[in-house]
Amino acid sequence: MKLLVLLALLGTVSAHQLHEGTPEQEVPAEQGEEEPGEPEPPCPTESESFRMTVPGSGGHTYRYVFVNNCQTFWRARKLCARCYRGRLASIHNYSTNQRLRCTARARTNRGQVWIGGVTSRWFWRVSSRWIDHSPWNYSNWARGNPRCFWKTCVALCTASGQWRSVRCRARLPFICEY
Ligand SMILES: *[C@@H]1O[C@H](CO)[C@@H](O)[C@H](O)[C@H]1NC(C)=O
Ligand SMILES: *[C@@H]1O[C@H](CO)[C@@H](O)[C@H](O)[C@H]1NC(C)=O
């Protein structure tokens, strides 16, 4: 009888750990992700940010900042908003992907950078979206991606231009669009 109780408890604990402890699970819902008590990071300095302007169709101009300062995904997003009145970049075609990859490769030093996508799972269904709400109409996943137990964020590999699912708490350089 005691043994059964013990087994039941162990079962509960490991189920609990499985639920709470995996990397993707550390990420709370959407906006959150504040480390309590940690001050807001200062805006990137000029030396760690590189601005690029791309003329688009119909006279529209796209502006990007490549920030070589490693932040978690949600902090990067906040910095894009606070420091550039922008957002993490979304990518809608191959040519933009290439352009951003090349500049990110030259201007950042981690091999991967955050772009503005997140992947989440609802039971067996894994889906990705841009946090700026633009349509998810292009993707360039590396083989075996997206990977997602609960929620992951999208990183662009600066060597291949392919995208990988990364734990949102990882700290990476990032690309803002404004
Ligand atoms: C790719 O996307 C950018 C920005 O969304 C746009 O300005 C450009 O015209 C597109 N290029 C092609 C070849 O569709
Ligand atoms: C994808 O979405 C972007 C952003 O709204 C849009 O500019 C682009 O034309 C779309 N591309 C295709 C192929 O539908």
What is the meaning of each model-derived region?
Residues 23-84:
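Extracellular disulfide-stabilized recognition modules
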Residues 56-59, 106-109, 121, 144-149, ...:
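Extracellular/periplasmic catalytic domains that process cell-envelope and extracellular macromolecules
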Residues 1-8:
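Classical eukaryotic N-terminal signal peptides for Sec-dependent ER targeting/secretion
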Residues 112-151:
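Surface-exposed ligand-recognition segments of extracellular binding domains, strongest
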Residues 73-108, 113-115:
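Conserved hydrophobic ligand-interaction patch in extracellular adhesion modules
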Residues 7, 168-178:
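Short, structured beta-strand segments at or near domain termini in extracellular proteins/domains
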Residues 75-76, 99-102, 140-142, 160-164:
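Eukaryotic intrinsically disordered and solvent-exposed regulatory patches
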Residues 8-24:
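N-terminal signal peptide
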